[in-house]
């Protein structure tokens, strides 16, 4: 049995015994058209600064998110700074939360804070196979006997709650008693449901200050829930990049505890596209510029005897370096994650996720 098969077998056993916890990241919600946190911040920032001129574009949120993505590829400003500037723009907490709700669910609304807020569970699952597979795992659960023990989500949205429909669940975004017989869904960064009646900013983690405040409070309900779950059940992380600093800190703390942990993460295998001839030529020219710099500095005086600029072997040399770095990079990522007590389950295509999740129920 290879490592991946062993991981899936462990997840199946945990599900059968009712001891499997799910950790959901932005990758789960993007399949339904919701923005990731970085695009959410920029889209809110753009529309806040140009509210009147951008109002017609609220009818076409895809353009706002596409522009945010374009800006992300070119901006050097840390998003934490942008988020802080955005928050300072709003004097009224209610206005900020309404704008966050409108931007988060822009694809569900008609641009005027109304729209399709009554979504059929079947429709939302068929349009997002990963969410559909997660929903099936939750629906197959019997509290205390089999299935999912709890869901910890780092997303604001209520897509899973909508998909679960009449299955008994409890959405939790602050310290509160657990309801017996209901699947707990912990929103540790806050909860902004689609069918909203009241939004409170103190319940969400949005700015860098709020993030640090949440991270440093070791006894906050959110941190305690995560530590208890990471150390007391088998965990599967879905749609998470594993780059969240607070989560890595918690994983590191749990890995030092005198308990046996069993956590897994579904991660896309890094793909390094081979450079095209033009890119290879640019890399070669850059390498030559370094050699010339060495010669001028006097650090290397015999490079011409060991390096032939007319030799075409540099193509293979560059490609072999890239391939070796790629191979070692995957191994190193696996090693670092396992040091944190997380066993990666690599996949090549996102279409594999629903299949892997479905196999847990088999």
Language-model features, listed with the residues they occupy:
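Ligand-binding beta-strand-loop-alpha-helix segment within the catalytic cores
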Residues: 76-168
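Conserved nucleotide-binding/hydrolysis micro-motifs of P-loop NTPases
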Residues: 28-30, 158, 192
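Short, well-ordered, mixed-charge alpha-helical segments that flank or form enzyme active sites
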Residues: 159-162, 194-198, 244-245
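Active-site gating loop/helix substructures
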Residues: 113-120, 166-231
